[in-house]
Amino acid sequence: MERCIAQARKYYAMKGELPFKEDYLKQDAIALNVQRACELCIDIANHLIKTKKLGLPQDSKDSFSLLQRGGLINEAMMASLRAMVGFRNILVHQYQKLDLDIMGDIIEHRLDALLDFANTALAASD
């Protein structure tokens, strides 16, 4: 997960010949790494749910709700992770055109939530 996040940040910061909004290769590289990091969080969440016997999530977003109800993450972390799953769903299923301003905001301000979750999950699994 750390590598995926580092790669996404690296690609975002790279200066290229094209502006970010026109550099589809850079956008795809970032999207793939963010998607992978989100999917790792979902996998970790589902593993914790199973080992702690917290129930059966109805979907990926619900995994984080179950962890919050089980006392393993706080409400702010749950909300942040559910939002990241929503962004991941847009990346994977292309529900709508990718909003590059949102992608930029995620790279600049929201990826640490995934790392925070990984650390929280690691502590909870002890």
Give the ranges of each region predicted by the language model.
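Solvent-exposed interaction patches of small proteins and small membrane subunits
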Residues: 1-126
